[in-house]
Amino acid sequence: LSSAASDVYKRQGTGSVSVEMALQCGSGRVYAVDRNPEAVSLTDKNKHIFKCDNIEIIGGNAMDNIEKLPVPDRVFIGGSGGELQQIIKMVFKKNRKAVIVVTAVSLETLNKSLEGFRICGAETEIVQVSITRTKSVGEYTMLCGENPVFIIKGTIL
């Protein structure tokens, strides 16, 4: 997600992406929505550690809060509580020009995001990233792969 000073963000998670976006967008606002009270607390802690006064943290379900938030320019979805397609539809309903980025660690979430973008007429770009660690096994160094993460970007042209 590239950012500009006027961009508005909506985010679900534990704070790392919210903080990064807040630092990038300068005078823009970041709205961090999470239904997990522990994640809300961690996001608030990181907001203060990194001096990000432009983050507004909202506890609760994304679907219950999207309508109340300003029209977003960029949206990051790191978890959806099973409502991924509905969230995608709702964001594009508010702003057809929004850029939505979803992270997925399962094929089912990848599929649901692609289907949600397809239903809305959005173009998609997918990047898959994975981490590989090494482990010493005798005189050999073995590569041990971690779970891959899919990053799906949806835009309506």
State each model region's role.
Residues 1-5, 9:
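Single conserved hydrophobic/aromatic residue that forms the stacking wall/gate
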Residues 13, 38, 108:
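Conserved Rossmann-like nucleotide-cofactor binding loop
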Residues 14-26:
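Conserved SAM-binding loop of SAM-dependent methyltransferases across substrates and taxa
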Residues 29-34:
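Conserved SAM-binding motif I beta-strand of class I
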Residues 35-69:
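S-adenosyl-L-methionine
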Residues 71-79:
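Short SAM/SAH-binding signature in class I
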Residues 92-145:
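C-terminal substrate-binding/active-site "lid" region of AdoMet-derived donor-dependent transferases
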Residues 140-157:
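Core SAM-dependent methyltransferase catalytic element
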